Amino acid sequence: MVIINNLTFNQDYSCVSVSTTKYHKIFNCDPFGEFYSSYQGSSGTKGDKPNDNDKEIIIDKGNGNEYNKIGEDSPTSYLKMLFSTSLTIIIPQNESVGNRLLKIYNLKQNMKICELTFPSHIIDVKLNRKRLCVILESGQIYIYDLSCVRLIKVLEISSFSSKDSEEETHQKLFVGDLGAEDKSLLVLPISNITDQTDLFNTENGVNVTRASDSNILTSLKPLIEFTENKIDKDIITLEDLQKDSNGWVLIYDTIKLKPRLIYKAHDSSLAKITISNDNKKIATASSKGTIIRVCHLESSDDEDVSKPFNISQIINLRRGHNIAKVNCLSFSLDNSILGCGSESNTIHFFRLSKQPHESFEYEEDPANESDPDDEDRSSEDLNQNLANLLISKTPDASAPDQKDSAKSSYFGVLKKKVEGSSRFMNNPYTQTIVRNLPYKNYFENLIWEPPRRAFAYVKLPEYTPPQLFNLHQSKNKVAIGFANTNNNGHLIMLASYQTGQFYHYQLPKPSDQPEPSDSRHECNLIAQYSLL
């Protein structure tokens, strides 16, 4: 039986790779076709090959070693492509010594360029044109300069293995992402950071495994956005953040080797993080999975790395009311749409850019008929929407559009409804919420928007036998990709871990007429293929 270990789109969604217990393959996405298999190398008989005109990265180790050809018997844990170039990262699956070997290949020539051996199991690999990040089960992130495969930094983080019992060891998944763009931002949960994580040593290639010191722990406050009043201290340590919540996020610059921002995304622990292609949007999902959060990053015009990023906007997206594990978040190429896959077997699509006919008029969030159990509903829904994710704008009385902005904001509409209603404002529950607002001194300047609902969805036409759930540590796991078409909008591409099926769906076109906020359209299935 062939078991899928990993399904991965390349950075521009032009190709999808499948790694299995027997082989690995690469397929062109649109039009669909296999163009590489470890059984036969580059076939070129099905579909198109990658675009060789794309910028290639040439790695010459200069050591005179012979390049080894890829063997036919190739059980593979991971295969990662670099855009549409021939440079490919392969992690062979080895039951005896573990997944400790990383090989870099030139698939166009079917040759191995170099290989790296690590002291622990490799649980994930992230790469772009500048950086290669290798994440180990023992709790290290090895950061390489990909142009010469030179180790420049090792981040010591918490271990990804935990014992469920005395005999059984459970491997946790890596929650984080590396931006595809050359700025190479690495986004991590603060819960992964330890006292030994050397975040502030910027010496390139020197003492790459140097441990942290006490001065580092006193340097976090200048990096923090959206700090709640209860930890508003002169010195904010790593321990303070981790005691407050597991939902804090760290943005680390792998080019300058220093952190750029720390912010609180959720109250509960993080289940999924992804960063957009332009490094300007970060989407996060908590372990509850009811609310997805998209943060818009802004950096200074002079690109001064001593200054932290700013968060200019936060968009709240409601996946649903029932708790479900989110296992995939993916931005479209133009960053206007976010796809979200979860164990509910429904893939939701959210529009991040506001349509011309849309407004911030408040509408009651309709009851979800499929969520009858209020006990399972996330506590995030109220306290985080009201307290943690309100964006504070500096008061500017001279701004000409300040009144118009307030009128169109969610808060402006709600304020009109409750203005003059002392019963609402004097309600003990309301007063408790207001007291906990992190920016209550800027209450009049908050831009407050209700969570957006998905405008489109896909319900996969497949059944997953229960015995397959444990193979992938999450039910109904998928990989989501996007392709732009000339006239018909976005083409959705879905790859299923459980069945090995590859689907093409058509995303509905935006309507020219206003629609109800809870209006959702099912995507049309165009084609279905097998990746096995």
UniProtKB/Swiss-Prot annotation:
Keywords: Autophagy, Cytoplasm, Membrane, Protein transport, Repeat, Transport, Vacuole, WD repeat. Disulfide bonds: none annotated. Required for cytoplasm to vacuole transport (Cvt) vesicles formation and mitophagy. Involved in binding of phosphatidylethanolamine to ATG8 and in recruitment of ATG8 and ATG5 to the pre-autophagosomal structure. Protects ATG8 from ARG4-mediated cleavage. The keyword DNA-binding does not apply. This is Autophagy-related protein 21. Its main location: cytoplasm. Residues 360-380 are annotated as: Disordered. It comes from Debaryomyces hansenii (strain ATCC 36239 / CBS 767 / BCRC 21394 / JCM 1990 / NBRC 0083 / IGC 2968) (Yeast).
